[in-house]
């Protein structure tokens, strides 16, 4: 179904206007579907993003400032989220051996188990299953170019 029918709008002023509305509408649908999966596991999208980032750092660990740089939502408070995930026993902090001011953050066994479970049931790949590899690559390139123009 095309956007006009889904949101019951007759016409857009321009293709660029339609693009903006289409991006927002699509984002909201994706966010809702992903949030439903995460809610069942007791984490928010921002918390899952932190867990995903820490998981990517693996054995080396990662600092809060590095997490902040990699977050999808730049407005999120990474320090507060790390503390919350630590209280949920999903992360732990360890002081750097050489520089005691630096804290490295790691997944606990419980955190690793949760990330693994979420990656197995994560709907992201399934949500994009209607788009072939070539089209996905083209869309990614277009979105990269669009984001660069902002």
Residue ranges and their predicted role:
Residues 18, 22, 49-53, 113:
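Pre-recognition alpha-helix immediately N-terminal to the DNA-recognition helix
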Residues 83-138:
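Charged, amphipathic alpha-helical coiled-coil/dimerization segments
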Residues 1-11, 134-150:
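C-terminal regulatory/oligomerization modules of transcriptional regulators
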């Amino acid at each position: 179904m095309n956007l006009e029918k889904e949101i019951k709008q007759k016409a857009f002023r321009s293709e660029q206007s339609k693009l903006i509305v289409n991006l927002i509408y699509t984002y909201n649908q994706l966010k809702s579907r992903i949030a439903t999966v995460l809610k069942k596991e007791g984490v928010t999208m921002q918390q899952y993003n932190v867990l995903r980032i820490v998981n990517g750092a693996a054995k080396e660990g990662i600092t809060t400032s590095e997490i902040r740089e990699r977050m999808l939502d730049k407005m999120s408070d990474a320090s507060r989220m790390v503390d919350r995930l630590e209280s949920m026993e999903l992360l732990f902090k360890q002081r750097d051996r050489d520089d005691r001011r630096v804290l490295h953050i790691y997944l606990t066994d419980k955190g690793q188990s949760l990330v693994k479970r979420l990656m197995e049931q994560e709907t992201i790949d399934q949500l994009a299953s209607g788009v072939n590899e070539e089209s996905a690559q083209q869309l990614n390139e277009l979105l990269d170019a669009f984001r660069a123009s902002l």
